[in-house]
Amino acid sequence: MLSLKKYLTEGLLQFTILLSLIGVRVDVDTYLTSQLPPLREIILGPSSAYTQTQFHNLRNTLDGYGIHPKSIDLDNYFTARRLLNQVRALDRFQVPTTEVNAWLVHRDPEGSVSGSQPSSGLALESSSGLQDVTGPDNGVRESETEQGFSEDLEDLGAVAPPVSGDLTKEDIDLGAGREIFDYSHRQKEQDVDKELRDGAEQEDTWPGEGAEALARNLLVDGETGESFPAQVPGGEDQTALSLEECLRLLEATCPFGENAEFPADISSITEAVPSESEPPGLQNNLLSPLLTGTESPFDLEQQWQDLMSIMEMQAMEVNTSTSEVLYNAPPGDPLSTNYSLAPNTPINQNVSLHQASLGGCSQDFSLFSPEVESLPVASSSTLLPLVPSNSTSLNSTFGSTNLAGLFFPPQLNGTANDTAGPELPDPLGGLLDEAMLDEISLMDLAIEEGFNPVQASQLEEEFDSDSGLSLDSSHSPSSLSSSEGSSSSSSSSSSSSSSSASSSASSSFSEEGAVGYSSDSETLDLEEAEGAVGYQPEYSKFCRMSYQDPSQLSCLPYLEHVGHNHTYNMAPSALDSADLPPPSTLKKGSKEKQADFLDKQMSRDEHRARAMKIPFTNDKIINLPVEEFNELLSKYQLSEAQLSLIRDIRRRGKNKMAAQNCRKRKLDTILNLERDVEDLQRDKARLLREKVEFLRSLRQMKQKVQSLYQEVFGRLRDENGRPYSPSQYALQYAGDGSVLLIPRTLADQQARRQERKPKDRRK
């Protein structure tokens, strides 16, 4: 019988000899060090901390333990297992290991060797390597495409670099990748990926490098490091690839991608107006990159030729097909004559950045051209992106954000293109003359401020910078006073609804100075209202005439009376004098109020003293000392009733003062007691803190004494050198500091005597 150790040892030796014969350097320490944990895990099995398998059994199979390692029948077991595996593999095609590795690297063009025939053990161990080349259920897939490319694939496989010397073909069976053996292989893989990315960029920029990109289209095996051709994708992948490349090329070269205002997509263009001059095959070729076909070519060069033909057809057909599709103008169309829309005008003609940033505004056409207004909406919307941009187009002229282009030529506005050809005639050139600008300014002023046409004509006669727009302006007879302005604005707003609506709309955002004018008529009205005061106005109104709501005038104090009596403006001093009563009435009213207040504050004794006509006040009666009070009484001739009232007032006053003093003393006493209580509480808290500290220090002292007592008692020895028992003896402290050793019974008696002495003293 062959022992297990000898069997395993011979197997390892044979494996090592086999590796050395192949030419691989075998260093067991390198494989078992901690620097390569994947190899260590592959050889020794997974760690026991992460798995429940029997990691000590090096002959562990998929079925677990078949027999005990020290069993006698171990040799028979291995023989039976080997024979059983041979019987099971009779219907399978057995391929040696070397042949399998060669089959992985070099692909058989005739497909005679299938991927579904290796044994079960080999399939389990080398599954990671097989998945990179063929799928688990591929088998032998012979199609017309693979047969057509078999010779090219053989040539590409022959050019593969040689296998590295550090890599053995048995490592593939272990499931270890090449990066485990060679750490520099990762850097090589990064370099290969970088080269592939650079080749893809060059492929996008220049079509002629398709063949070189095809030559670089190789896959590197993750375990062996050898290069083999990539699997040819199916029809769906190729279609997706061509679609992505076509879209990228269309974005880079086709003018439709750059025009943001293109009115319709490609499908709507082809369905709306098909071109009669083009054959149907040409239309299909134009949209071939965007449609998924059933069959797609595999040649990259043919794809690039198709894309180049698409680009050439687009460049030829832009000037003919797109203009006819978007707008087919009849010969006498006013739009083609007025706006110079030639049929051969390209879409991407010189477009400035300023014009491209403006949005379309087709609603402004009706203000200037009745022909454009009569067109349907669909035709005008499709016309907008095709307006020639080297002239002053409607989008840049009447856009909602371009006010400078309305009054300045394109050369001053900076939106014209210098490289453009001769400019086309501007359809709006004769509309913006000087007279029209003046009329527009006056019309805006009349609409915004609520003027009637008569007042607008009067303002037109004296149209200068100082005609009434400044605060202290020259007094012209044509300017309006405050009353005239208010009446005229109200009449104009009630007479025409359009002017009132425009004035209310424009007054919310216009900020163009005052509208009320300080004129001669205002000065005359103020002089008539003031009389001899001679008030000269030094201010001007800052209220707009379009604000007709009286609630909006409440912020100005000198305009509050306008909504009540409808009189002329008056000076603030005149308003104050008109509102206030005469001075005499003010004085009388103040005295009466003061007297009523004093009457309410007076007591009953004061009322009686005033009724009895006593010549001195109650304060003197109450507060004067006795001698001064008697002298005061001797100075006046008083009746008995007056004297009795004075004595009663003095007595009640003295009693009141005494009661007040008593209450004051009581309050002072209460306050003093409160202070004393607070002081006692503070003292109590302080004493409690001191008591706690004393108890803590006393406890510490007792602990120290107890520890010292135990230490001293533990060191005491009798004549024989034995320690004294603490249950029989105790230490006694004398007054002079000496310590005595006495029996425990005597010590207990002395302790009881000391306890009785305090009790006798209490009695």
UniProtKB/Swiss-Prot annotation:
Residues 116-131, 466-514 have a biased composition (Low complexity). Residues 645-708 form the bZIP domain. GO terms for biological process: cholesterol metabolic process; regulation of transcription by RNA polymerase II. InterPro entries: bZIP (IPR004827), bZIP_Maf (IPR004826), NFE2-like (IPR047167), TF_DNA-bd_sf (IPR008917). A motif (Nuclear localization signal) lies at residues 752-759. The record marks W103, L104 as: Cleavage. Residues 589-604 have a biased composition (Basic and acidic residues). Residues 180-188 are annotated as: Cholesterol recognition/amino acid consensus (CRAC) region. One of its GO terms (cellular component) is nucleus. The modification Phosphoserine is found at S519, S590. A motif (Destruction motif) lies at residues 466-470. It comes from the Eukaryota. SMART domains: BRLZ. GO terms for molecular function: DNA-binding transcription factor activity, RNA polymerase II-specific; lipid binding; RNA polymerase II cis-regulatory region sequence-specific DNA binding. The keyword Heme does not apply. Residues 647-666 are annotated as: Basic motif. Keywords: Activator, Cholesterol metabolism, DNA-binding, Endoplasmic reticulum, Glycoprotein, Lipid metabolism, Lipid-binding, Membrane, Nucleus, Phosphoprotein, Repressor, Signal-anchor, Steroid metabolism, Sterol metabolism, Transcription, Transcription regulation, Transmembrane, Transmembrane helix, Ubl conjugation. Signal peptide: none annotated. Residues 673-687 are annotated as: Leucine-zipper. The cholesterol recognition/amino acid consensus (CRAC) region directly binds cholesterol, as well as campesterol and 27-hydroxycholesterol. Has much lower affinity for epicholesterol. Belongs to the bZIP family. CNC subfamily. This is Endoplasmic reticulum membrane sensor NFE2L1. It comes from Bos taurus. The gene is NFE2L1.
